[in-house]
């Protein structure tokens, strides 16, 4: 039976870039389940991709807020739609991602795959993340993006979040969910059908879990990791044992900082440049360009991000030509 890959894509702008991403991945084994932020007009995306039989736009869209639970809700809806159509593996992407391995290479990889490709860490191993679950964050009610900017027109947003972060340490802390260990990790992952089935059933059977994460910070970077890593699926996660050894070594040496984390790329096969966290030379994460060519060529990853259609134009053409075998 042919390997079936469902690509789940969250996008909010740049319809032509989304078209290019779909074209780079499109093949007989692929289906696409796309969520377009409800804040934007979906018609430009439908005009470009709506007539493709294997492209399915989510009809019950959500207003997607950066760092909000709305992003988890959009992902859950895409997962449910993809599961109804059937797949062997699903791959979660953003509209600013792009493959750096050919379609043939991706299919060959997933035909042999027997793991869950999701990067993770225990919040105990990354203490700077603990606040994300220790306080109530009403991000979907009061969007947090750019709240401190002088261009922010809604004064009460600046006031609320400014006061929140100033006095947060004095607020009572939430108790984490009983019987679970808190995990985090990047949004972007590749999961098998049976693992996704488990996740969807867990969410349905445990409504309190969803309620808890609705008021956390960046739940999309914790929600799925915590379900999977607290289940029998944990041992199927790529590099699970390596993480355990690394974590034990840190504990033995009483290391409690965020430094020297294992590379996410070793778990989820996604290339992202975070050098901007320690240098002002690039954004966080970096918009990739020709400077990144050698790193992409040497990467084991399947996908990279972020790409911009203008700033990454030369790099994208080179990826098409030399890595994906797509003629111009």
Feature map (PLM): residue ranges:
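ER/Golgi luminal nucleotide-sugar-dependent glycosyltransferases, focusing on the catalytic module
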Residues: 1-328
């Amino acid at each position: 039976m042919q390997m079936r890959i469902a690509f789940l894509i969250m996008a909010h702008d740049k319809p032509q870039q989304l078209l290019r991403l779909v074209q780079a991945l499109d093949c007989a084994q692929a289906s696409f389940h796309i969520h377009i932020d409800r804040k934007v007009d979906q018609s430009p995306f439908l005009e470009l991709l709506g007539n493709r039989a294997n492209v399915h736009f989510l009809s019950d869209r959500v207003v997607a807020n950066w760092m909000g639970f709305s992003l988890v809700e959009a992902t859950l809806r895409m997962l449910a739609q993809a599961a109804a159509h059937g797949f062997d593996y699903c791959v979660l992407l953003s509209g600013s991602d792009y493959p750096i391995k050919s379609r043939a290479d991706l299919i060959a990889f997933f035909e042999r795959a027997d793991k869950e490709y999701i990067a993770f860490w225990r919040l105990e191993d990354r203490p700077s993340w603990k606040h994300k679950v220790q306080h109530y964050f009403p991000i979907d009610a009061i969007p947090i993006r750019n709240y401190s900017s002088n261009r922010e027109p809604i004064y009460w947003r600046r006031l609320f979040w400014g006061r929140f972060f100033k006095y947060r340490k004095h607020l009572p802390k939430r108790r984490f969910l009983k019987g679970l260990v808190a995990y985090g990790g990047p949004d972007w992952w590749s999961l098998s059908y049976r693992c996704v089935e488990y996740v969807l059933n867990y969410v349905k059977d445990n409504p309190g879990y969803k309620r808890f994460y609705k008021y956390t910070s960046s739940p999309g970077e914790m929600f799925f990791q915590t379900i999977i890593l607290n289940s029998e699926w944990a041992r199927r996660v790529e590099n699970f044992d390596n993480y355990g050894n690394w974590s034990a070594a840190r504990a033995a040496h009483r290391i409690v900082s965020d430094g020297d984390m294992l590379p996410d790329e070793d778990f989820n096969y996604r290339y992202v440049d975070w050098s901007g966290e320690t240098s002002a030379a690039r954004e966080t994460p970096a918009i990739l360009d020709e400077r990144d060519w050698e790193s992409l060529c040497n990467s084991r990853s399947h996908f990279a991000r972020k790409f911009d259609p203008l700033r990454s134009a030369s790099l994208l053409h080179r990826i098409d030509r030399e890595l994906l075998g797509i003629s111009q």
